[in-house]
Design a protein with these regions (language model features):
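Conserved catalytic core of the tyrosine transesterase superfamily
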Residues: 1-186
């Protein structure tokens, strides 16, 4: 399976690889069959766009269930980042944390960076995809842009230090360009 060929309209620069939603769902389905932790970790990364170093440091105390927010401590370039979480993932996360039943505040996903890279690669291989954890972050951003999210808001959600970093996600597949072109009436 191949990644999507994408371009920035301004200078046809290749941008980061990403997965279509269907590909992410396929990977999540494979993970769910093997491990609840792996499934939730991958879903959390895709639905929040967090980096590996950020997800492995999330503790139960970082989760604000009432506000559907997770506080990411030690976020790259910032002391803290607040990411939003959809209700379904929040519910799964709540159930998972309750099942951990630990009196302390250990990481929700007690796993190393190398282990995250390995499991992402393993589940990607099930769909013949050569991916890495940051592919999920890129996919998160692309899906939000395609859904109409403004770049400034995506910048805040992603924790990017500048808007120019976020602009890389203003990309279009060949099919997207064709569809937009055909909608124009001459």
């Amino acid at each position: 399976m191949r990644f999507n060929k994408t371009y920035l309209l301004s200078n046809a620069t290749k941008i980061p690889d990403y997965l279509e939603k269907e590909q992410v769902v396929e990977i999540l389905r494979a993970a769910k069959l093997c491990s609840q932790r792996d499934f939730l970790l991958l879903r959390f990364m895709w639905r929040t766009g967090v980096r590996v170093s950020e997800v492995i440091n999330v503790t139960p105390n970082d989760i604000e269930y009432k506000n559907s927010v997770v506080n990411i401590r030690k976020a790259k370039g910032r002391p803290q980042l607040r990411v939003l979480l959809d209700q379904e993932t929040l519910r799964m996360l709540s159930d998972y944390v309750l099942a951990l039943n630990t009196p302390e505040d250990p990481p929700v996903f007690p796993i190393s960076r190398a282990q995250v890279f390995n499991l992402v690669k393993r589940y990607g291989d099930t769909g013949d995809l050569k991916i890495h954890p940051h592919t999920l972050r890129h996919s998160f951003a692309i899906h939000l842009v395609r859904s109409g999210m403004e770049l400034r808001r995506l910048q805040l959600l992603s924790g990017h230090s500048s808007l120019s970093i976020t602009q890389v996600y203003l990309q279009f597949k060949d099919d997207d360009l064709r569809e937009a072109y055909e909608r124009v009436s001459f």
